[in-house]
């Protein structure tokens, strides 16, 4: 899905569910990490997270678009557009938009694991942070530690 398709989708959803046109820009923002989308108050544009579309498909994206359009139309008409406002919550229910989007499954960020072993007593240590083996020693026998495995 490219920028023109997302613009067309937002305009269609706006007319279908809200009965009002969307007159500004809708675009994907690759810098969004934990949020499905955002409505920009200054420019009235809507930014969407492309990774939600890749992960959950068009249905979830339409839900995110409806949520952001609730912010948009309420702000344009001068009513309460914030999450805590009654107008916003009522409009969410009326158009069946989600209040929150699904959690992002973060598969690309694997946790690094470092495995150290004592050269004297062979005790193994598993750590998430790398340690300085010249400075730290085994807590059991004070032997020297060596890095045996690093997984990412």
Swiss-Prot record:
Q: Which UniProt keywords apply?
A: Cytoplasm, Metal-binding, Zinc
- Identify which residues the record assigns to the active site: 68
What is the predominant subcellular site recorded for this chain? cytoplasm
What are the recorded Gene Ontology BP terms? response to stress
Location(s) in or outside the cell: Cytoplasm
Show the GO cellular component annotation of the record.
cytoplasm
InterPro entries in UniProt: SprT-like_domain, SprT_Zn_ribbon, Uncharacterised_SprT-like
What is the recorded name of this protein? Protein SprT-like
Specify the species: Bacillus thuringiensis subsp. konkukian (strain 97-27)
């Amino acid at each position: 899905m490219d920028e023109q398709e997302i613009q067309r989708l937002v305009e269609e959803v706006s007319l279908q569910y809200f009965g009002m046109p969307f007159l500004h820009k809708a675009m994907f923002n690759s810098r969004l990490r934990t949020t499905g989308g955002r409505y920009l108050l200054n420019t009235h544009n809507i930014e969407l997270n492309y990774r939600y579309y890749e992960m959950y498909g068009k249905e979830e994206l339409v839900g995110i678009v409806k949520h952001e359009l609730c912010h948009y139309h309420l702000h344009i008409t001068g009513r309460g557009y914030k999450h805590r406002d009654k107008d916003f919550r009522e409009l969410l229910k009326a158009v069946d938009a989600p209040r929150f989007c699904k959690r992002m499954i973060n598969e690309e960020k694997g946790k690094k694991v470092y495995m150290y072993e004592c050269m004297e007593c062979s005790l193994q240590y598993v750590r998430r942070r790398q340690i300085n083996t010249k400075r730290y020693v085994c807590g059991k026998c004070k032997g020297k530690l060596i890095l045996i495995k690093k997984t990412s």
